[in-house]
Amino acid sequence: MVQIVVRDNNVEQALRALKKKMQREGLFREMKARQHFEKPSEKKARQRAEAVRRARKLARKRAQREGIV
């Protein structure tokens, strides 16, 4: 459970801290995923697509670091 301490009645700062913690813990992603049921086949396809995206991004970064691109 995420807890935030409000100091000096500064609610805006507490909200920013809450959003940052929720983002870091992946709660926004989980809430979005749980809004609708996802069939196992769709889940596998999405995960494969994400893996391909990550691999391409990593390859792009490696190529840029090595000076190929």
From Swiss-Prot:
Q: What protein family does this chain belong to?
A: Belongs to the bacterial ribosomal protein bS21 family.
**NCBIfam families, alphabetized:** S21p (TIGR00030)
Q: Does the keyword Ribosomal protein apply?
A: yes
Which HAMAP family does the UniProt entry name for this protein? Answer: Ribosomal_bS21 (MF_00358)
Tell me what this protein is called: Small ribosomal subunit protein bS21
Question: TM segments?
Answer: none
Family matches, as Pfam families: Ribosomal_S21
Matching InterPro entries: Ribosomal_bS21, Ribosomal_bS21_CS, Ribosomal_bS21_sf
Q: Which PROSITE patterns match?
A: RIBOSOMAL_S21 (PS01181)
Task: Give disulfide pairs as residue numbers.
Answer: none
Q: Which residues form the signal peptide?
A: none
One Gene Ontology cellular component: ribosome
Recorded source organism is Hyphomonas neptunium (strain ATCC 15444)
Whichever gene encodes this chain, its name is: rpsU
Q: Name one GO biological process term.
A: translation
Molecular function terms in GO for this entry?
structural constituent of ribosome
Claim: Ribosomal protein is one of the keywords in the record: yes
The protein's UniProt keywords, in alphabetical order, are: Ribonucleoprotein, Ribosomal protein
